[in-house]
Amino acid sequence: MKKHLLILLSILFSFKIAAQTEPVYSTDGNETWYYIQFQNGGAVLEDMGDNAKLLTKAAAKTDNQLWKVVGTKTSCTITSKNGRSIYYEGGRFGTSSTKKATLNLYSTTNASYKPAWEIQQEAGQSMNQWGGAGINKELGQWSANDVNNPLLFVSPKDIEIRGEEPKILKEYAYSSVGTKFAPEEMLTLWYKDPVTASTVTNPWMEFALPIGNGQFGGMIYGGIHQDRVQFNDKTLWTGSNKIRGAYQNFGCLYLENLDSIFSTETTLKGVKNYYRSLNLQNATGEVNYASPDLAIKYKKEYITSYPDQCIAIRLTASENGKINQKFYMYNPNGKETVYEDGAGVYYGKFQLVSYYAKMKVIPIGGTMTTDDTGITVKEADEVMIILAGGTNFNPAQLSYIDDASTLASKITERVDNAAKKTWTEIYDAHVKDYQAFFNRSKLTIEGAENTYDTKALVDRYNNTSINRTGKEPSSLMLELLYYNYGRYLLISSSRGVELPANLQGIWNNSANPPWQSDIHSNINVQMNYWPAESTNLSELHKPFLNYIYNMAIVHDEWKTYAKNSGQTKGWTCYTQNNIFGHSDFMENYVIANAWYCTHLWQHYRYTLDKDFLKNVAFPVMKSCTEYWMERLIQDRRVKDGTWVCPDEWSPEHGPGKEDATAHSQQLTWDLFNNTLHAIEALGDDAGVTPEFVTSLKDKFKNLDTGLHTEIVDGKTLLREWKYSSYSAGERRHRHMSHLICLYPGSQLSGTNEYFQPAVNSLLDRGDASTGWSMGWKINLWARALDGAHAHKILKAALKHSTSYGTDQSQGGIYYNLFDSHAPFQIDGNFGACSGVAEMLLQSHTDTIQILPALPPVWVKGSAVGLRTTNNFEVDQYWDNGKAEYAVIHSGSGATCAIKYPNIDKAIVKDASDNEVSATVVNSNTITFPTKAGEKYTVHINDPVGIGTVSANNSSFKIEVQGNKVMILGNGFEKVDIVEANGAKIATMSKASFELPNTNGKVYILSIHKQGNKMVESAKISF
């Protein structure tokens, strides 16, 4: 019967009461009690005590949340069951036993929430969830009909009581692994303490470790006594296409240790040899520890599988029958978990989406029992837990949702299918799937060593007495980890549903995260995808690109915003966006559409995928171009005849509205330039009229480029505003919106007259800033071809941040290597990752620039598998700060152009070791033809040539090309060839020969001359 009841309940997903009538007014001896529940977010009012501020809370069984209304609709008082009445003072509502306010119940006209009520203390001003919807909000006053005003009077029998959050258990006493420990895999984050032992105010943000399959993911706490996996799904949002809402915490899975051999009080019964880790090479979290006597070793493994669409956890021990655990879940958004037959389920509904989560416990050996509090396993050999969750969100539906009645069966099927498999089957499929992306590219920095735990790496990096030169093994290791972590996070947060990674990727433990963890269009979501193409993760760009297509072409909201701005064609969006097409904040910032289009074009430039260009990118770009061709006006201030963007904003400072901001003009330049190139690439498939092309070219020809200068303190800077002066903004502002032309755009190169003013502006902006801002600056300094300064910013970006609230002076990282704005924002992780790639390889000019901004501290290393425009993949090797050789993999057979100092002397060979004829453009640039699917080795300083030639005024000249050696001069007889260690290679009677295995070798040549006993020597170093 319980199972049938669960199935029936699981399709209801009821969040709000459908109808709302006027509350019954209480009188003496006839009292009616209500929960007062806000429509947006579902929180209820709670009496916090005498003369205390009123707060919003999750509904619970407490008299503090029960209220009676006395009087009439237009003149009433509201009093809690504890006898305290609502009053208004000092800009906030509170409760008091001696004070009360005369209130009015106003019937809201908010279209999203009516029928509902608003509580007013004065006409036109309503009680409002201050700072956004959610729990723990103070109540202020705001204009009537705001989305955070409407509320319902809900009978106690109808309220949805949320499950009680599990009591947090004190961590066991423990000791960590010794100082000689090092992880097996170099690319591993590892720690000596469980998150559950931390005393910081936000251990989730500081220490928990992320896992994810692109859409569904979790944060691992690594606890021993009571472990926790907080989990998310990218589609779990409050709000709708009319209400911003916020990204939500899906809930928590708890694993409680029932072993009696451990104790919280004494190290005699404490855990031994504890450590937890996140292996970036196989996307696996682990917790390892031993029993107090070291006899039993325990391990927990955590993955989020893309093939099986679930979080999978395995618990093992070195002896059978030693796993004793209890498993339970917590739903922070609604109903309690229902447990049955080794499984747990909870579900609910927000304004638009319904959600469903299920976990299943699969023990091997031992016993398993289930009751209303969870699932208990005793004396098992091994336990596997499968956890899945999702919503009925569907971006292909105009309503954004599917029928909720099928959601439970979809998630249940997902869990059951995974539960039928062995751990090995699930794990092997996960690793194979993940490594197909991660292993495409590898960065090596010689000297890096992972011999300190990651917290210690961060501390050592920030200790100037330790990190003195930047070449210390621990310093190099942190930089190497941080780059690879960026690629790991992108794989883990950008697959599956056609939605981009948001401000926090997919990881969020709050009902009201900073900036709602939204899709922020004025830098943040774009930065999330900067490393996608260059670090060889092109497919992971697609969720963002397809999101743009869906919003711009399939759905209507963004087209409506275009009409609202006065245009009849095209689409646009504003600064803050949810997943349902809703967009708001700074509604004159409409240039975001052009910025989005640069991503569509970049994907084509890197892949040369004509189908994508024709069917996805170009329709969006053309529509956006039509919008701007219609919106542009001729300059109305200086009247120079140029076309300018009206009433724009340079995020997030300076004039709130001004024509021709550098930011908007540069992005429009990019849009028009890229659209013309797209038309050329598509030919007739572009489907545009000659009149359209002519009009576009005319607008482009006379477009203000956004490149203007001004003199500040004797230096020529790029202007941020065409009209307003430098002083209109903040000198050290975090946004560098007027430098789009330098990065991520490609309007400027080193030969452009505006290049140096742009660099001067960058220098003037300063170094330290928010985390994401420093991520941007790494890329900008790389484009400025200054590797030392780019590395200086990277070093600042790796400063440990000590703030978990909004604090723009606390940019850096947390100990889990999450980027800190502060607080956590994932864009900084991706910006730094992209910045490292830009230091090592650039191709925005369609010329591959080898090591354009190599930091001096990265003396020797390799970068394998980075990608460039024109569908090339490049492997680079360097030593002593100089490129030795590069391997070019041609994906489409385009002509390859390469730039590096004195590359005109390089030798190019194909895979068969045949020399390829290269055209010398200048001493620093060559080009050569390629064939699709072929690879080419460019020997730059490989070999470096003759080291020394000695012997009485040598009569021979030696030339080296590749591994070919030619001895020129009269009287040659033979040459003896030995390695530097004395090993003889050969004696050659010909003056032209090839040397084997040249990379890194040193050969000594002893040249014999006819009729002369003298031997002349030469040394050749490769």
PLM regions and their residue ranges:
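Acidic/histidine-rich catalytic neighborhood
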Residues: 623-681
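Glycine-centered coil/turn sites that cap beta-strands in beta-rich domains
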Residues: 947-976, 992-1000
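C-terminal tail/sorting-segment detector
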Residues: 944-950, 1000-1022
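Aromatic-residue-lined binding/catalytic grooves and analogous aromatic/hydrophobic interfacial grooves
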Residues: 168-585, 597, 602-604, 622-626, ...
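Short, glycine-anchored, charge-dense loop/turn motifs used at functional sites
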Residues: 486, 978-984, 1003
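C-terminal catalytic domain of Rieske-type non-heme iron oxygenases
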Residues: 505, 509-510, 522, 643-647, ...
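Lectin-like carbohydrate-binding module/patch detector with strong preference for beta-trefoil
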Residues: 20-171
